[in-house]
From Swiss-Prot:
Region Disordered, residue ranges: 126-198
InterPro entries: Nucleoplasmin, Nucleoplasmin_core_dom, Nucleoplasmin_core_dom_sf
Name of the protein in its database record: Nucleoplasmin
Keyword Chaperone among UniProt keywords: yes
UniProt region (Acidic tract A1), positions on chain: 35-38
Pfam families tied to this protein: Nucleoplasmin
Organism name: Aquarana catesbeiana (American bullfrog)
Length: 198
């Protein structure tokens, strides 16, 4: 996997390559693997499995052969069954595998083309060093800055409506008191009283 991408850009985003293989009568299996020396994390996301134009009108079954793990009784898993007259191509969604991965043509003569996306993520341990450096800088800044006094709590301003209502009430009270002072006391029967029965 030779690349002209700089080391810093690899850390920013993963390297993504188009990948593909062919299974046929001569090559019934294919193993996708990466070198042991490569420290990057690799994933293979399958996209399509399709028949070639020379494929016979028969069923072609493609399966993934799980790795032999001690004490495991894993069997091959079929991922596509294709036939030129019925289904010449299958789109794969959500099949992301970690290498090594072995594909096998269980039945049929092919050719079958498997394609996908090979993503390589370089292990990035520089973040730990950067965080340590940032913490030291923050500690130095805290030591240099004296503690700032607490900020006073602001009271919310009274709303305009409340102020206007209060102003109107005060004006009304003033008018009533001025009317009482200006007008002489009324004489006669009391207002609002019921007349007494004779």
């Amino acid at each position: 996997m030779d690349s002209t991408i700089s080391n810093t850009s690899k850390l920013d985003k993963p390297v993504s390559l188009i990948w593909g293989c062919e299974l046929n009568e001569q090559t019934k299996t294919f193993t996708f693997k990466v070198s042991d020396e490569d420290k990057s994390e690799h994933q293979l996301a399958l996209r399509t499995v399709c028949l070639g134009n020379a494929a016979k009108d028969e069923f072609h079954i493609v399966e993934i052969v799980p790795q032999a793990v001690e004490g495991s009784d894993a069997k091959p898993v079929p991922i596509a069954t294709l036939k030129p007259s019925i289904l010449p191509m299958a789109t794969m969604v959500g099949i992301e595998l970690t290498p090594p991965v072995t594909f096998q043509l269980k039945s049929g003569s092919g050719p079958i083309y498997i394609s996908g996306q090979h993503v390589a993520l370089e292990a990035d341990y520089s973040w730990a060093e950067e965080e340590e450096g940032e913490e030291e800088v923050e500690e130095e800044e805290e030591e240099e800055d004296p503690e700032s006094p607490p900020k006073p709590v602001k009271r919310p301003a009274a709303s305009k409506k409340a102020g206007q209502a209060k102003k109107k009430k005060m004006e009304k009270d003033e008018e009533e008191s001025s009317e009482e002072e200006d007008s002489p006391a009324k004489k006669g029967k009391g207002r609002g009283r019921k007349p007494s029965k004779k």
